[in-house]
Amino acid sequence: RHRSFEQMRRASIGRDDDERRRLVRAMFQSIGMNSLEWLHSTGWSDERVMEHIEFPEHEPGEAERAAGNGQINITAHMGNWEIFPRAYGIHTRRRLMILMAPQRSPKLNDWIVRTRSRGFELVMTEEGALKPLRTLRRGDIVALLADQDSTRNPGIFVDFFARPAYTPSGPAHLAYRTGAAILPMVIM
């Protein structure tokens, strides 16, 4: 919580420290709620998933998919990022590959892989770029969380709220090598 509070202060988010504390509390409550929703949804049918998720009438990527081009979806740890890829794959009727960094705990990693991999292919980032390249060249979708400050993967530092933040370069390399569009997405 302290780190989140300090980051909000540096970014001038909130009128004062009291408001920042309320925002941090609300953020952690939201993460808890999203986690419970995800756990609850793991047994849902595709139809039930789509009863709870709406997509805009004209959403980004429609033209790319219609042309048969690959698509790179980038999201962040916002909203229910765990439910989104499954719903998006159902919505687009396209094969979806998720790139995932392995967790430190093998037991947690195995559990996450089992629960996340329903309805799409899950590939560990350490496996390299060959599978994502093939997926994009087939005209399918690769999705990843790009807001993690991890120097395990190639990237560069860019200023974010006046501080250097590590930004992975993998999505740009995949787009360059395949011509796939990069689409930022979020579920709210």
Predicted feature residues:
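Membrane-anchoring hydrophobic helices of lipid-metabolizing enzymes
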Residues: R1-T75, N80, K107-F120
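Short secondary-structure boundary/capping segments
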Residues: E62-A63, Y88, L133-R134
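Membrane-associated lipid acylation/remodeling enzymes share a hydrophobic transmembrane-juxtamembrane segment
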Residues: E127-M188
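Catalytic core of membrane glycerolipid acyltransferases/transacylases, capturing the structured
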Residues: D16, A67-E127, R138, D149-R163
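Residue-level "edge-of-site" marker
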Residues: R21, P102, M188
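Short, hydrophobic/aromatic alpha-helical segments in well-folded domains
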Residues: P60, F84, W111, G128-K131, ...
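Structural motif corresponding to alpha-helix initiation and N-cap regions
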Residues: D17, F55-H58, E126-L130, P168
